[in-house]
């Protein structure tokens, strides 16, 4: 009798332990399910911006060009598109210029197809200038979350010593009004720096770009009055060997800084990183 009672108690204890274990497992599964959309989209759970590069159905290239620059060099954008899926679908490319004018072109991508444009604005839009381009394959007629694509962007130019390029980060998260920072700018006889933003809203956007040196001293402030749906860039009018920019937009925006070698026009693109205390 005593043996049977002890056996029954051990069985009940084991069942309770298994029940508690299942509850903990279910709590973990539910927590993971909440985080999964952010993980799948390549986003940090505390931000709308991408944490890693992933295939997507909506991508912003924050800076594109087909324009003559400060030193007389012509800057062009090389865009590479790749469809890793088994579907054939269109990607709508929307070019936003400095005035907020928007031009749309549909690019059909076959399954497994790759397209490369050495002068994207000239080849696709038959235009010159500078701005930003949004690529979209889901929020269009006949779109689907299955129509994912991969994109790579570069601004390049040719000088007497050869070809030089600047890799441009592509963005898959939404624009926001949060403060953001671009660290590592430089302005001297060898390098120049620009700050810019794409206003992803239908309202005028006043973006205050505060420039600090490495000791956190405010050196200068550049104010960008960006029209609705427009892109704007301006030079940093100060000399500093190392510094950073704090962007404060009044409307949702994608902001960046770019450091350019004055001799080669080789550049370093620095997308602004959001910071929310």
Where are these regions (language model features)?
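Short, Lys/Arg-enriched N-terminal segments with co-localized hydrophobic residues
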Residues: 1-21
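Bacterial N-terminal signal peptides that target proteins for export
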Residues: 20-29
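Bacterial N-terminal signal peptides
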Residues: 29-37
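Gly/Pro-rich, tryptophan- and cysteine-flecked surface segments typical
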Residues: 40-277
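N-terminal start and proteolytic maturation junction detector
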Residues: 14-16, 37, 41
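Enriched - but not universal
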Residues: 11-12, 31, 159, 234
